[in-house]
Amino acid sequence: MLSRTAAPTKASARTLSRAAAEQCRTFATVQDGSANPVRHYGGLKDQDRIFQNLYGRYPPDLKHAKKMGDWHKTKEILLKGHDWIIGEVKASGLRGRGGAGFPSGLKWSFMNFKDWDKDDKPRYLVVNADEGEPGTCKDREIMRKDPHKLVEGCLVAGRAMNATAAYIYIRGEFIQEAAILQNAINEAYADGLIGKNACGSGYDFDVYLHRGAGAYVCGEETSLIESLEGKPGKPRLKPPFPAAVGLFGCPSTVANVETVAVAPTICRRGGNWFAGFGRERNQGTKLFCISGHVNNPCTVEEEMSIPMRELIDKHCGGVRGGWDNLLAVIPGGSSTPILPKHICDTQLMDFDALKDSQSGLGTAALIVMDKSTDVVRAISRLSHFYRHESCGQCTPCREGSKWTEQIMKRFEKGQGREREIDMLQELTKQVEGHTICALGEAFAWPIQGLIRHFRPELEARIRKFAQENGGEALAGGWQRNARQQGKLVSPGM
């Protein structure tokens, strides 16, 4: 694994050695491995937090939203124009909060291509509220507690890309959240904040709410667009990209709920204010969802680059049974590779630091596992989830997810051979990068993380099974007395 130097205090920066930087070059966003990003950590105060009603202290209505600063000087922001808004978002260093981490200002600017104003097609902002990643619940909290942040964010982000309307595609299971968000949209219309002449700015902008039907794959932007158009939720080949041919064949941009919701605050307080938190290329604040074996599971807003251990100890009351009882953490939702305790000890929570550790920030949903966890069974359960949610369009994903689930079920019981571990690793590598959307990587990476860090556990189960059953399991999980038992179908089929 990558070598890290332990820090004497939790406020000091963790730096990679030159050798480790060279080793992780392919995983790092930072191109110069010798240059450590400047870190500005420790300055976040309660009044700096964007989502002031994250814990539901006040009703999620327009009256209380205005008291907490929402819709303040929104007209002035709109009148400054799209170039100014995009400039502030670029200056803030905001990166997509849905998992990919693409620079938001750059992504939004793609909508304002040359001669865009001569194109008579409508233009759309599509908000991805189809939050289905296991362990992730940040967008749900925004829509349930701070819906006006999202509605105002749609208006500001829509102005940045000169959109005519926003479609919020919300997960079908979010019944309460959909009702609260629709009420916030109705309040904004009634107050003249959206619709014709939004906020008195002369800019017309509509917001529509569309409920999905529960498919995880619709969290991918082109699958979401297909579903929004009334088609089966299956991803499109790119190019053309949505900024050119998106929803209903019109220029569109798909953005995450959290990404859109922070835009008005960035414009009000300034991009440089937002960039003052975290470190270079990893700026701003972020919603972290912490679940699993902690004393107080929660969703909390913290600044980027906070140490993982401090995040868990400060907001969750620590790991159940103490930090020494920690086994591993999945740091960014179920699709990111698992990290063992010795890495978590000094791990920073941002895009680059987690790439250096061969994982990812993803949705910043930490799933904490203590030493009572059956880690093989946990990853096997994720394999079942991704097999179930595969849309079946791409052969590597359709077939690969089925086979990885079957192999992981056998590994749970020790019914395998050591060479099958390498075969499983190779199978995931063959799927990775060979599918239309990222679901192929989503089911491959957790297994790769398991093999990378917990291979001895897999081997120990295989040896234990061999000792108890007179030898290793036969290929495919067949038992030696299968014929006598009348079993003619391989396990898992």
From Swiss-Prot:
Highest taxon of source: Eukaryota
GO terms under cellular component: mitochondrial inner membrane
Chief location bin: mitochondrion
Boundaries of the annotated transit peptide in chain numbering: 1-27
An annotated Gene Ontology molecular function: NADH dehydrogenase (ubiquinone) activity
Keywords: 4Fe-4S, Electron transport, Flavoprotein, FMN, Iron, Iron-sulfur, Membrane, Metal-binding, Mitochondrion, Mitochondrion inner membrane, NAD, Oxidoreductase, Respiratory chain, Transit peptide, Translocase, Transport, Ubiquinone
EC code: 7.1.1.2
Pfam family, any one: SLBB_2
Function: Core subunit of the mitochondrial membrane respiratory chain NADH dehydrogenase (Complex I) that is believed to belong to the minimal assembly required for catalysis. Complex I functions in the transfer of electrons from NADH to the respiratory chain. The immediate electron acceptor for the enzyme is believed to be ubiquinone.
Protein family membership: Belongs to the complex I 51 kDa subunit family.
NCBIfam families: nuoF_fam, PRK13596.1
Protein name per its UniProtKB record: NADH-ubiquinone oxidoreductase 51 kDa subunit, mitochondrial
Origin species: Neurospora crassa (strain ATCC 24698 / 74-OR23-1A / CBS 708.71 / DSM 1257 / FGSC 987)
